[in-house]
Every structure is written in structure tokens, then in C-alpha cells.
UniProtKB/Swiss-Prot annotation:
Cytoplasmic membrane side: 141-176, 610-646
Stretches that traverse the bilayer: 120-140, 177-197, 589-609
Superkingdom, natural source: Viruses
Parts of the chain on the Lumenal side: 26-119, 198-588
Oligomeric and partner information: G2 and G1 interact with each other.
Function: Glycoprotein G2 and glycoprotein G1 interact with each other and are present at the surface of the virion. They are able to attach the virion to a cell receptor and to promote fusion of membranes after endocytosis of the virion.
Single GO cellular component term: membrane
Keywords for this protein: Glycoprotein, Host Golgi apparatus, Host membrane, Membrane, Signal, Transmembrane, Transmembrane helix, Virion
Entry keyword Ion transport: no
Protein modification: Specific enzymatic cleavages in vivo yield mature proteins including glycoprotein G1 and glycoprotein G2.
Protein name: Envelope glycoprotein
Organism name: European mountain ash ringspot-associated virus (isolate Sorbus aucuparia)
Sites annotated Cleavage: 197-198
Glycosylation sites: 72, 80, 101, 247, 336
């Protein structure tokens, strides 16, 4: 048997083992789990729809909303401009505009019809201005006499500077050369109005080893560009102005008014004034003669005078803008690579990762604002106490400034009571009298949404195309399509292919649309945007086919807008709309046919008149040449028969 000492030692050893095993099996506290997850957090905001609201989420990140409310621990509801703190950094997001679920094919059709209408308007305006244009041509032609020596026609004697078509020269409204120039201008105007793609007007310019694009600065707008066959997607994540501000004063509003000193006299205002100074050693703020005083005075009524003060509450800070700078974030995706362009200064060249031309300094009209919390108001603010501006009472440099104009009134009771309406002037302190802006204030900065128009971005040429090096087709492994048919959002097409040490070509076809892109070496995925008009359709990418059954349009599907630019610097005119116009249902075809019947006469008239002017021009030149030859022959005959005797 074990001794008592051995038993005690064995019991102690068992207890230690049990405690050690228990410690190993105790769950990690929730706070420790959160710390571990928070340490793995990468703050990347993701915007999505939840019912009728937009929310932004930071996966695996604990966030702190600044001007909105939490949706859950990692998501927050969105307002016009949403500020969220994640990992001690402030992220700015703008509420997306509601993407319409209208029919994309009808939208495209209406867009094409608007081009036709624009062409008709151009035709009518030029036709109405025809005589004025001829007069302008005549004035320009006449002005050449100051810079060019004129010539004289041997047949009709008229002066000319370049060419002489009409002989004799007619009125300027009937000149053949003016008609020809007019119809050339008219024809080219109609041609470019109809065929020039609205998304592609400002997009591409070639500059040596760069392809310059003009990016539309519109938040939550996704734009595709092709540079030397390679597809680039630019997504405008943020576009704001940031105002650095300085505090001018804290505007206050009087909310409670109290009597400080008071006295009365039967000797009128002067007597009351004298009594108050003698009693309190200060001048009274107000003087009131009672109508009834309860027989305080026998031969007159009492005069009351005294002082008062107001208790104030702060309603906001009057701030002034001292500096303005841009806040632009653009996400660029090409194949498996993602870059981010950050523009945070005006008049600054950016060379990496893309060449960015400087943005011109923005001049703002409003420099003074009132901020309270995250809200920003604008109006006319007081620099000194006045009734003609907002905030006559304020605190600046630890000094309280008030518009002290007490207002009291008689109670008309038989005593010396009176009512103090106010001591410090309370009006012009109501926030409802100011204009609430869509800006957001946080930490001595004001964030204001702003579109900078077109941003010039230079895409470096990759240099893979020498000798048709990229022409071989890449081997496609998988095709995925996300989105809806015949909707404003369109579809996102993701093609997975085999990685290679060299670049290759990817050709995808669906409906009447063909997408042709080069894929970079050592990449496996290419994403691009497109539109499909049918629910059931087939997409083919490098001989891999996939049947699609797309969903209907949904307002909750995608929150950003996309364009359909698929041109290049070498194709400034977009002719794809002609094919797409034919690939629509019979209802739209009938509608287009009716419009075309009305328009075709107008559009055919322009090339007809141009051709007529050219033929007339050539015919008159032949006539002039013939007349000149006959005149020379007649001159020779005259020299022979009526010349001087030999």
C-alpha cells in the first residue's frame, strides 16, 4: 500500500495533469479571436445593395462609421458621402446613383435615333444658313486681296485669286465653287454626326510610345479602353474635392434670458438711469415705463431699468477654406494586374503606374461654411455682430461676441412686472435659414463631390506586337458570364485561359458582337464588359462555346454603370452601331424603318447635291477651256487678216 506521502504526491501530480489538459481545451476568448481576425484585415470597401439601401462592407474588418450608422460589425449604411474609419484610416465613398433597369436595346435605339435627329437639325440649320455661308465665303475670298496678288480672266475680265470656274462670274449665291464647298461641309457634318460614337469622341490619341485616352471622371463609372489590342478597364472609385479649413468662430444661439440687475424710479428715465448707476455702478441695458404700477408712484407711473444676460449654446463652427485639393481614385485592371491611380494634387504630373496630365486648379466661389458634426451649411456669415448676416453671436479667440440688444415688454398688470423677450439678439441663428449642402465635414476637412470632366491618361505601349507575335489563339479553359440581358448594367464576361510565356489573342463572339483582345504573358484571366439582348444566347471564345441563360434586369444586380467603348486610336469612328441596330426585334425594326423613310430623302439629297456640284464644276471648266481656245483662235485670225501690212 502507498504511504500517506506517496498518496499525496500522486494526487498532486494528477491534479496538475488535469489542470494542464483543461488549459489546453479552454476555448480562445472572443476578444482574442477578434484580434486575430482584425490583424488579417485588409480594408477594401465593397458596395452592394440591401433591399432599397446601399451598404459598404469591409470583409473581416471592424469599422467605425463617421457620418452614418452600422449595418453590422463589418458593414455600414451609405449616405450621399460616406466616411468610414478602418484600421485608423478614413475611407470616402459616394452613394451610387440608382441604375435603371430599363431596356438596353431601347436605350441604344433611342440613342441612335437622337443621332439621326441631330443630323436632321444640322441639315436644317445649314440649309437655312446657306445664303449666309455663301456670303461668308465671298467675304473670305475678297479678303485675300490683302495677302495675295489677284489675276484677271482674259475672257470676261473678272478678277480672281485661285481658280476661275464661272465665266462670266455670277452672283456669289450662284458660284459653283461656293456650292461645292458648302455641300462638302454639309455631307461631312451629317456623316460624323451619325457615325461618330458619343463615348468615343474624346477617347484615343497616339503620342509616340503612349496611347492617350480621355477618361470621363464620373464616380462608379466603369470604362473599357483598348491600347494596341490590350484591354484596360478604368473604374472611377472616388472623385471629390477636399477643402482644408480653418476655424473662424463658434456660432452660438441664446436660449435663456435672465435678469441680472433691476431698479425703478418715479422720476422718469433719467431718474431711473441715475439710480441704477448709483446702485450697481453700471449703465442699464433697458428702460421701460409701466402703464400701471400698482400705485408705486402717486403722480406718474414707475420707470423700470436694469441689465440682463443670455445663456448660449453652440450651434456650429464658422470655418473658412484655406486650401483645395482633388481626391481622385481610379482602379485600373488589365488581365490579372490591378493598379490604383491616386490624384491628390493640382498641377502635378504623375508618371507611375500611368502617365497622368496635371489637373487644372479649381477655383471655388464659396469659402465660408458652417459645420456642425458632419453636416455642412452655406450662407452669409457675420464677421461682426449684425442683423444682416447669420450668427451675430459667436466665440472667437476665447472671446465672446454678442449682439446685445435687450427687448422687454410691459405685462400691463398693476405692478412693476415686465417680460424679457431676449437680451442677446436671437434671430439669424436658425440652421433652417441656411442651405444644407451635400458636403461632409470631418477632422478639419470638408469633402465635396466633384466631377473633373475628362482626365488625360497615357497608357504605355507594351511592345509585344512586333511581327504579329501575339496572333496565335490562346487556349480557353472556362467562360463565365455574370449579369442580365437587355439591361443597363449589361454583363461581365470572365474568360480563363492557359498561362503562357508569350502573348496570344482572344476572340469572343456573341450575338452580332465580336471582341478581339491580346492577352498578356503569364496571365490566366481576362474580364470585359458587354451587352446581350437575348435571354438565351451562345458565346464562343476561341472555339469554346457556352450556352447562356441570362437573368432579367434587376435593380440590385450591379450598382455601377459601364460604357461600351471598344474602339482604338486607329479607329476614331465607331461603325459597330450599324450591326447592332440590325440585331434587334421586329418591333424596333419597324420603328426604325418608319424613321428611316422620313430621313432617307434628306440624307440622300446631300450627296446628290454634292455630286451635282462636282459635275457642274467639271462641265464649266470644260466650257471655260473651250471658250479660251476659241478666243485664242479668233485672236490669231484677227492678227492674220487685219494686222499691219508687211
Amino acid at each position: 500500500m502507498l504511504s500517506v506521502a506517496q498518496s499525496s504526491a500522486l494526487f498532486l501530480l494528477q491534479a496538475i495533469c488535469i489542470l494542464y489538459i483543461t488549459k489546453l481545451t479552454i476555448p480562445t476568448p472572443v476578444s482574442e479571436i477578434n484580434l486575430v481576425r482584425q490583424s488579417d484585415c485588409v480594408c477594401v470597401p465593397i458596395i452592394s445593395r440591401s433591399g432599397t439601401d446601399y451598404i459598404t462592407c469591409f470583409n473581416n474588418c471592424q469599422i467605425e462609421p463617421i457620418n452614418t450608422k452600422l449595418y453590422n460589425s463589418t458593414c455600414t449604411k451609405m449616405v450621399n458621402i460616406t466616411l468610414v474609419r478602418c484600421n485608423n484610416e478614413v475611407y470616402v465613398m459616394t452613394l451610387p446613383n440608382l441604375v435603371s433597369n430599363r431596356s438596353h436595346s431601347w436605350e441604344v435605339l433611342i440613342n441612335y435615333l437622337l443621332r439621326f435627329i441631330s443630323a436632321i437639325i444640322v441639315y436644317l440649320l445649314l440649309s437655312i444658313s446657306k445664303q449666309g455661308i455663301f456670303l461668308f465665303f465671298s467675304i473670305v475670298h475678297y479678303s485675300f486681296k490683302f495677302i495675295k496678288n489677284k489675276k484677271s480672266c482674259n475672257i470676261c475680265g473678272n478678277d480672281f485669286y485661285f481658280i476661275h470656274i464661272d465665266c462670266p462670274k455670277p452672283d456669289f449665291t450662284k458660284r459653283s465653287d461656293f456650292h461645292m464647298m458648302f455641300y462638302i461641309i454639309l455631307f461631312l457634318s451629317l456623316f460624323f454626326v451619325v457615325t461618330h460614337a458619343d463615348d468615343n469622341v474624346y477617347n484615343y490619341y497616339e503620342h509616340g510610345d503612349l496611347t492617350e485616352i480621355q477618361l470621363l471622371d464620373k464616380e462608379h463609372y466603369s470604362q473599357d479602353f483598348v491600347s494596341d489590342g490590350f484591354l484596360y478597364n478604368f473604374y472611377v472609385e472616388n472623385s471629390h474635392l477636399i477643402y482644408d479649413i480653418s476655424n473662424i468662430s463658434t456660432i452660438t444661439r441664446p436660449v435663456k434670458h435672465n435678469e441680472v440687475t433691476s431698479t425703478w424710479s418715479c422720476d422718469g428715465s433719467s431718474g431711473c438711469y441715475k439710480d441704477h448707476v448709483g446702485k450697481y455702478n453700471k449703465k442699464p441695458d433697458y428702460v421701460l415705463k409701466k402703464v400701471h404700477d400698482g400705485f408705486s408712484c402717486f403722480f406718474t407711473t414707475a420707470t423700470i431699468c436694469g441689465t440682463c444676460k443670455s445663456e448660449h449654446i453652440a450651434i456650429g463652427d464658422h470655418v473658412r477654406v484655406i486650401n483645395v485639393k482633388p481626391y481622385i481614385h481610379i482602379v485600373v485592371k488589365t488581365a490579372n494586374k490591378t493598379d490604383k491611380i491616386v490624384i491628390d494634387e493640382f498641377n502635378k504630373f504623375i508618371h507611375e503606374p500611368y502617365y497622368i496630365k496635371p489637373i487644372t486648379q479649381i477655383h471655388i466661389d464659396q469659402h465660408d461654411f458652417l459645420v456642425t458634426g458632419s453636416k455642412v451649411y452655406q450662407g452669409t456669415f457675420c464677421e461682426r455682430p449684425s442683423k444682416s448676416c447669420f450668427g451675430p453671436n459667436y466665440i472667437t479667440s476665447d472671446k465672446t461676441v454678442t449682439l446685445h440688444e435687450p427687448k422687454i415688454r410691459d405685462t400691463f398688470t398693476h405692478d412693476r412686472e415686465y417680460i424679457i423677450d431676449y437680451c442677446d439678439y436671437p434671430s439669424n441663428s436658425d440652421l433652417e435659414s441656411l442651405e444644407l449642402t451635400d458636403m461632409v465635414h470631418h477632422s478639419d476637412k470638408i469633402y465635396s463631390p466633384y466631377d473633373f470632366g475628362l482626365i488625360s491618361i497615357g497608357i504605355p505601349k507594351l511592345g509585344y506586337l512586333a511581327g504579329g507575335f501575339c496572333e496565335s489563339l490562346v487556349s480557353v479553359k472556362k467562360i463565365e458570364v455574370y449579369g442580365c440581358y437587355d439591361c443597363q448594367n449589361g454583363v461581365k464576361i470572365s474568360v480563363t485561359y492557359e498561362s503562357s510565356d508569350s502573348c496570344h489573342t482572344l476572340i469572343c463572339k456573341h450575338d452580332s458582337t465580336t471582341h478581339r483582345y491580346f492577352v498578356q504573358q503569364h496571365t490566366t484571366t481576362l474580364n470585359f464588359h458587354s451587352f446581350m439582348s437575348k435571354k438565351d444566347t451562345i458565346i464562343e471564345c476561341n472555339q469554346m462555346r457556352k450556352a447562356l441563360n441570362l437573368d432579367e434586369s434587376s435593380e440590385t444586380s450591379v450598382y455601377f454603370e459601364s460604357n461600351g467603348v471598344k474602339g482604338s486610336a486607329k479607329e476614331p469612328v465607331n461603325f459597330d452601331f450599324i450591326k447592332n441596330l440590325l440585331y434587334i426585334d421586329y418591333k424596333k425594326i419597324i420603328f426604325v424603318f418608319l424613321v428611316a423613310i422620313i430621313s432617307i430623302g434628306i440624307f440622300l439629297r446631300s450627296p446628290y447635291m454634292l455630286l451635282s456640284s462636282i459635275l457642274k464644276f467639271r462641265k464649266r471648266r470644260k466650257v471655260v477651256a473651250t471658250n479660251r481656245s476659241e478666243q485664242l483662235v479668233m485672236d490669231d485670225d484677227v492678227d492674220v487678216f487685219i494686222g499691219p501690212p508687211s
